[in-house]
Amino acid sequence: MLTKRIIPCLDVTAGRVVKGVNFVGLRDAGDPVEIARRYDSQGADELTFLDITATSDGRDLILHIIENVASQVFIPLTVGGGVRAVADVRRLLNAGADKVSMNSSAVANPDLVSDAAAYYGSQCIVVAIDAKQTEAGNWEVFTHGGRTATGMDVVEWAKEVAKRGAGEILLTSMNRDGSKDGFDLALTAAVSDAVSVPVIASGGVGNLQHLVDGITKGHADAVLAASIFHYGEYTVQEAKEYMAAQGVPVRI
């Protein structure tokens, strides 16, 4: 059985790491390079680095921060935010990213997923999906940092991007984001069971059992968290030891 990954997430705006609740109420969590270095030393399997206002503000990619982080960190780095074209993928890979995540731009132009995967390989293309539960009980895709409803069904969109060559899906529950109530396990399992590519569960981790549940009940291949690591509640090493004790295969 493949080992399951723990991925701390750095949401960045204006050059600082921040954390909010349900995509709003952002609170400063520190310097991205320092935080990335800390997670590397704690044994994180990967880091995800999202410029959360690049698309909604129409700003350019923050390449200098990515270069700084990549020069300090020797674990795989996924970078997203403001990716609008295949050329942006190249610029991020050249700056030191190992994988590039796209979200709003993939919804606006699904060919971007196919073209980027064909050119650079599926292994470095991640599609991030921000999902919100509707009153009907299914999940809708939102874009532009969770501000724009698309009317698209999350499970169908996940199947579409996997078919187009996305090597991985980063699935965030907007309802659970920052809530510390645990992953939306029904959402995570619905997407994980519908696609053959790895799914990263995101949104809602408040304790170490939530990480285990994301794998065992949500069928995710990796679990992503921010608050529990940024503010020192747990280290990545503690999370891995807990998961291993619960029978989840992790790299210690």
Swiss-Prot record:
It is an enzyme of class 4 (lyase). CDD domains: HisF. It comes from Polynucleobacter asymbioticus (strain DSM 18221 / CIP 109841 / QLW-P1DMWA-1) (Polynucleobacter necessarius subsp. asymbioticus). It is found in: Cytoplasm. Pathway: Amino-acid biosynthesis; L-histidine biosynthesis; L-histidine from 5-phospho-alpha-D-ribose 1-diphosphate: step 5/9. Its EC number is 4.3.2.10. It catalyses: 5-[(5-phospho-1-deoxy-D-ribulos-1-ylimino)methylamino]-1-(5-phospho-beta-D-ribosyl)imidazole-4-carboxamide + L-glutamine = D-erythro-1-(imidazol-4-yl)glycerol 3-phosphate + 5-amino-1-(5-phospho-beta-D-ribosyl)imidazole-4-carboxamide + L-glutamate + H(+). Its main location: cytoplasm. This is Imidazole glycerol phosphate synthase subunit HisF. IGPS catalyzes the conversion of PRFAR and glutamine to IGP, AICAR and glutamate. The HisF subunit catalyzes the cyclization activity that produces IGP and AICAR from PRFAR using the ammonia provided by the HisH subunit. InterPro entries: Aldolase_TIM, His_biosynth, HisF, IGPS_HisA/HisF, RibuloseP-bd_barrel. Transmembrane segments: none annotated. One of its GO terms (cellular component) is cytoplasm.
